[in-house]
């Protein structure tokens, strides 16, 4: 599996730890972030990883900034990206199973390296369940592609 990883200056150390962890798992890692502690604008890394995921240059993306929020917002501006910010493993796992997320973000100032590895592992090991979740992801894709949503009353059930 080929993983694109991006970060800002606040997350260099954690990016390096996660990159090594991914390599130990047998993943190929492509670095789209910075390797120095000099100020680096997180939208650049978020966008680059998002584009790489959307274009199919990498299979999945991982983003790390101070909180994970800003960098994920940048990635989510790229059509086809479903980035999630997670600070614990359960949400990471369910984001893949239910939302088919393709980019994971977390904060270097929020989680430590061991927790970050657990979040990454749960996210990578989870698989999209499809079923009722497929319809919901399709609705997200419709919003992404059209910047709108046409929900017909017969399709809007209590399950939705």
Predicted features and spans:
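Internal, active-site/partner-interface "lid" segment
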Residues: 124-153
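Glycine-rich phosphate/diphosphate-binding loop of Rossmann-like nucleotide-binding domains
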Residues: 1, 5-24
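A short beta-strand-loop structural module common to alpha/beta enzyme folds
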Residues: 28-39
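Helix-adjacent hinge/juxtasegments
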Residues: 45-85
């Amino acid at each position: 599996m080929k993983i694109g990883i991006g970060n800002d200056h606040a997350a260099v150390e954690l990016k390096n730890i996660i990159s090594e962890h991914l390599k130990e798992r047998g993943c190929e890692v492509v670095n789209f972030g910075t390797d120095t502690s000099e100020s680096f604008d997180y939208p650049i890394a978020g966008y680059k990883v998002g584009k790489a995921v959307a274009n199919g240059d990498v299979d999945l993306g991982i983003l790390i900034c101070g909180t994970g929020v800003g960098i994920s917002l940048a990635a989510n501006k790229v059509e086809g990206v479903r980035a999630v910010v997670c600070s614990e493993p359960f949400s990471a796992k369910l984001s893949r199973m239910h939302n088919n997320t393709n980019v994971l973000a977390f904060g270097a100032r929020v989680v430590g390296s061991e927790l970050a590895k657990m979040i990454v592992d749960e996210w990578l090991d989870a698989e999209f369940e499809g079923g009722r979740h497929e319809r919901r992801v399709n609705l997200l894709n419709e919003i992404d592609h059209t910047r709108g949503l046409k929900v017909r009353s017969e399709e809007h059930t209590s399950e939705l």
